[in-house]
Regions:
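PLP-dependent class I/II
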Residues: 1-184
Length: 184
């Protein structure tokens, strides 16, 4: 979570521990997205039921992956402080570039992606817009509709946890977006 915001674990609120299942993943925090390792924190009676369900849905992660995960879980606060500092700098770099281009967007308060508002281009489909963006501008994006239950076709998601050079190149390409993608 970026300053000045502060994360509050729901289970720490009064009366919520016994009624909360916290699900999380190691994938993004430790840059191991392909491993698909996660965990839950819950009262013991819920953990017992979850273990039974888990046995029927999946097999355990390979031992080397589990050992690597334990290493990550033992990192001290400095790891997370450094990660937050790096992501804050990348967010600020990318947001400034988008502001300079004049594209409407969200300002993430804890994520490492930005949602761009593409409504000015008049596309009926965010998926089609993403195809055109990749083909004509050279920037990959994920359709925003992938993340909403409601029909939302005016948002796309761009990821900024990349090398600064990659972000500058993406911003350079996006600076020509209005020339390369005609309004409909």
């Amino acid at each position: 979570v970026y300053a000045p915001n502060r994360h509050v674990y729901f289970a720490t609120l009064p009366g919520m521990w016994e009624r909360t299942i916290s699900c999380s993943s190691l994938s993004k925090t430790y840059s191991i997205t392909g491993w698909r390792l996660g965990y839950i924190i819950a009262p013991s009676n819920i953990i017992e039921v979850a273990k039974k369900v888990h046995d029927f849905l999946t097999v355990g992660a390979a031992a080397p992956l589990q050992e690597a995960a334990v290493t990550g879980l033992r990192f001290g606060d400095e790891y997370y402080d450094d990660l937050r500092e790096k992501y804050t700098a990348k967010r600020d770099l990318f947001i400034k570039g988008l502001n300079d281009i004049g594209i409407k967007h969200t300002v993430p308060q804890g994520a490492y992606y930005v949602m761009l508002d593409i409504s000015e281009f008049g596309f009926e489909s965010d998926l089609e817009f993403c195809d055109v963006l990749a083909r004509d501008v050279g920037v990959g994006a994920v359709p925003g509709s992938s993340f909403f239950r409601e029909p939302v076709n005016s948002l796309i998601r761009l990821h900024f946890a990349k090398k600064d050079e990659t972000l500058y190149e993406a911003l350079n390409r996006l600076s020509d977006i209005r020339k390369k993608i005609a309004k409909r």
